[in-house]
């Protein structure tokens, strides 16, 4: 079982390892049980899809493949790539940037 993931949907991230290294995108989906994320427009794979109905087109389509959460890093608007810390204010837990302290 994987630990708690600090990456959430709609986070801006940069890929730090693999064939898409250095590219930035937004997290579309988080796969908590597999410790993976799907980043919009990155890590595209070709998949053969079967025709489902008369109107639906079958054939080869490109879809986004999951990336290991350890291969992406959250981007802070102020200082760029950063790690995430948690801060409790007024009983609410918020994610903050470790470099500049801004809320993410």
UniProtKB/Swiss-Prot annotation:
GO terms for molecular function: rRNA binding; structural constituent of ribosome. SUPFAM superfamilies: Translation proteins SH3-like domain. The keyword RNA-binding applies. Keywords: Ribonucleoprotein, Ribosomal protein, RNA-binding, rRNA-binding. One of its GO terms (cellular component) is ribosome. GO terms for biological process: translation. SMART domains: KOW. Transmembrane segments: none annotated. It comes from the Bacteria. Pfam families: KOW (PF00467), ribosomal_L24 (PF17136). One of two assembly initiator proteins, it binds directly to the 5'-end of the 23S rRNA, where it nucleates assembly of the 50S subunit. One of the proteins that surrounds the polypeptide exit tunnel on the outside of the subunit. Part of the 50S ribosomal subunit. HAMAP family: Ribosomal_uL24_B. Belongs to the universal ribosomal protein uL24 family. This is Large ribosomal subunit protein uL24. It comes from Treponema denticola (strain ATCC 35405 / DSM 14222 / CIP 103919 / JCM 8153 / KCTC 15104). The gene is rplX.
């Amino acid at each position: 079982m994987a630990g708690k993931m600090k990456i959430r949907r709609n986070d801006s991230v940069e890929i730090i390892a693999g064939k898409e290294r250095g590219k930035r995108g937004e997290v579309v989906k988080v796969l908590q049980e597999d410790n993976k994320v799907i980043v919009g427009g990155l890590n595209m794979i070709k998949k053969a899809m079967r025709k489902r109905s008369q109107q639906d087109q079958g054939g080869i389509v490109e879809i986004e493949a999951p990336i290991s959460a350890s291969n992406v890093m959250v981007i802070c608007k102020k200082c760029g790539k950063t790690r995430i810390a948690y801060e409790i204010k007024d009983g609410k837990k918020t994610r903050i940037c470790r470099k500049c302290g801004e809320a993410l």
